[in-house]
């Protein structure tokens, strides 16, 4: 009798653990993406109209991927005029600013690439919020627009 009771308690727990894949749900990832859109629009730096923040894709549409999966994608651009700054100085400043915003304000873990440190043609920033199922990539350009940002959810079952 005791074995039956133990089995009745342990079986649902074992099923719950085995059925959870460890990845976030599509709904949770999509909600976190929308929070990032709001964070970007209300960010102290990027809400300056001179930076010309443009949300090109809001991340509110399901895009089919994989077998029965979906993802959402947010794309945005912003610009900071270079004025008389040297290209390298402009890129250094813009890269540091975007890395700080993504890591400190948005909570992304960034993969730093020291090999592109003095690249005059632009810089790439990659990162993720693993627990939220989000990946970020940003391109820092010497030409307008300075920042090209993309955040997307992993391909998850809806």
Residue ranges, per PLM feature:
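Bacterial N-terminal signal peptides that target proteins for export
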Residues: 1-8
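Extracytosolic low-complexity repeat regions of secreted or lipid-anchored proteins
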Residues: 85-154
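Oligomerization/assembly interface segments of phage tail-like spikes and tubes
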Residues: 70-82, 147-153
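Generic serine detector
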Residues: 6, 18-21, 25, 42, ...
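N-terminal leader/targeting segments
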Residues: 2, 14-72, 80, 92
């Amino acid at each position: 009798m005791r074995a039956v009771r133990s089995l009745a308690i342990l079986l649902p727990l074992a099923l719950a653990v085995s059925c959870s894949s460890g990845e976030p749900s599509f709904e949770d990832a999509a909600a976190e993406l929308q929070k990032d859109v709001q964070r970007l629009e209300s960010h102290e730096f990027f809400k300056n109209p001179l930076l010309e923040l443009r949300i090109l894709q809001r991340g509110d549409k399901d895009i089919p991927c994989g077998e029965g999966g979906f993802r959402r994608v947010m794309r945005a651009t912003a610009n900071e005029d270079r004025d008389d700054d040297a290209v390298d100085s402009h890129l250094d400043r813009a890269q540091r600013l975007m890395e700080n915003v993504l890591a400190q304000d948005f909570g992304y873990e960034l993969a730093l690439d020291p090999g592109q440190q003095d690249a005059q043609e632009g810089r790439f920033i990659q990162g993720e919020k693993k627990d939220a199922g989000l990946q970020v990539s940003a391109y820092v350009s010497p030409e307008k627009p300075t920042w090209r940002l993309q955040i997307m959810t992993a391909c998850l079952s809806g």
